Swiss-Prot record:
<keyword id="KW-0991">Intellectual disability</keyword>
<keyword id="KW-0560">Oxidoreductase</keyword>
<dbReference type="InterPro" id="IPR018506">
    <property type="entry name" value="Cyt_B5_heme-BS"/>
</dbReference>
<feature type="binding site">
    <location>
        <position position="361"/>
    </location>
    <ligand>
        <name>Mo-molybdopterin</name>
    </ligand>
</feature>
<dbReference type="GO" id="GO:0008482">
    <property type="term" value="F:sulfite oxidase activity"/>
</dbReference>
<feature type="binding site">
    <location>
        <begin position="377"/>
        <end position="379"/>
    </location>
    <ligand>
        <name>Mo-molybdopterin</name>
    </ligand>
</feature>
<comment type="function">
    <text>Catalyzes the oxidation of sulfite to sulfate, the terminal reaction in the oxidative degradation of sulfur-containing amino acids.</text>
</comment>
<keyword id="KW-0887">Epilepsy</keyword>
<dbReference type="InterPro" id="IPR014756">
    <property type="entry name" value="Ig_E-set"/>
</dbReference>
<dbReference type="GO" id="GO:0020037">
    <property type="term" value="F:heme binding"/>
</dbReference>
<keyword id="KW-0408">Iron</keyword>
<dbReference type="Pfam" id="PF03404">
    <property type="entry name" value="Mo-co_dimer"/>
</dbReference>
<dbReference type="InterPro" id="IPR036374">
    <property type="entry name" value="OxRdtase_Mopterin-bd_sf"/>
</dbReference>
<feature type="binding site">
    <location>
        <position position="264"/>
    </location>
    <ligand>
        <name>Mo-molybdopterin</name>
    </ligand>
</feature>
<dbReference type="GO" id="GO:0005739">
    <property type="term" value="C:mitochondrion"/>
</dbReference>
<keyword id="KW-0349">Heme</keyword>
<feature type="transit peptide" description="Mitochondrion">
    <location>
        <begin position="1"/>
        <end position="79"/>
    </location>
</feature>
Amino acid sequence: MLLLHRAVVLRLQQACRLKSIPSRICIQACSTNDSFQPQRPSLTFSGDNSSTQGWRVMGTLLGLGAVLAYQDHRCRAAQESTHIYTKEEVSSHTSPETGIWVTLGSEVFDVTEFVDLHPGGPSKLMLAAGGPLEPFWALYAVHNQSHVRELLAQYKIGELNPEDKVAPTVETSDPYADDPVRHPALKVNSQRPFNAEPPPELLTENYITPNPIFFTRNHLPVPNLDPDTYRLHVVGAPGGQSLSLSLDDLHNFPRYEITVTLQCAGNRRSEMTQVKEVKGLEWRTGAISTARWAGARLCDVLAQAGHQLCETEAHVCFEGLDSDPTGTAYGASIPLARAMDPEAEVLLAYEMNGQPLPRDHGFPVRVVVPGVVGARHVKWLGRVSVQPEESYSHWQRRDYKGFSPSVDWETVDFDSAPSIQELPVQSAITEPRDGETVESGEVTIKGYAWSGGGRAVIRVDVSLDGGLTWQVAKLDGEEQRPRKAWAWRLWQLKAPVPAGQKELNIVCKAVDDGYNVQPDTVAPIWNLRGVLSNAWHRVHVYVSP
């Protein structure tokens, strides 16, 4: 019924271009055999059966009620004088109880009455509650139209304090003072260094994650690099020649473009914390995103420096240009065999979704290693070398490793475990959210699935009863080559809600082409760093009466 309400409201608003509909709308008393006919505007429905007549009456009533409420709100808004509000005042209005306020430019709006009418659903509009609309309109360009602005104008309650529109002065003593501006939809796990993930309902809205809401994993302050003076240093092989490559030099190599999903080793760590405390950021399901990356192949660059695949074990070590106060840079490594394999498609990427890399994601150059944990995709790349052993970086030798549930911080031996490279099969539910109330009748469940090493996801199973019975979800996304399934699959299931059911325990699990399956519970895979968290994902929801 709510969906019909929204549809009628939107069609009337668009048809009238949000101008005042003539107030002479007569409602005739109807018998059971009469049709409901407002004189203006004329609404015509097809079909003569009683069901159609019932929906005709209900749809028109809903539409008429929305129009009258809208007209009343417009009149009240016009009568109010302009008020000045601070950014702090706006940020305190984020719920129906306090009122839901947003800003656009210098204007402040109270959209409390409109939230339930939002075509994208209340949850999308609530992401902007207490803050600016611009970052969200940038994601969804359909909003930037005159009739949408006219609708919003009716909810204006005042102006934003001019002082709140002045950019703050940069404090040069603060190593994080020059960090880039981030999208307000991101759920922040750490401000310094900045680490954040998109909310679930935005994460799977698109197959390709928009740059502003791509999950951000930083270990140190974000460097501000000049593309004109940037140089990538590639140490040459014995008898070869070391390279100092400008951004233009990298562009002169053959350009390759691939779609790759990046996932942090700590994705879904928060679920491990529920079993037993772990050390690390409390990532939920959003430390994963997908982009279209473009750049030069690492194997081509290494070959120009004289490197070739050798029989002995060797590693390609990467160093970033981000560093701590001691000058220590972030570093990581991958096996030389992967780096030199053209089929592995490792990139020195300079573009992300058709644009230069954003600063948070490694501008001007980062490593992209398809099928491998995000920790090896070194950003702000400054140096590449081939070494007989893996990188001695803390993040390679003393982090991002998995251990038995029995290992604690008193007994852990980091040298005893290999560094994480390929990640296990993974899936998660993004809609509905845990604790949400869903409509009876049918529920739509959405999520993502991915597996490391280029292994393709071949199936996602979904249960509404905690795993007692299962249904197979529909997979969406690009078809990928065998052993090169570098990107995730989005999935969806429309399932009937059992009659009389008051709650649902929704569960999902993915299967890859190696028939690897997610474990059913967290406890057996718990580890002190909270990495490799890929148990069945569970969401508990309530069913409306």
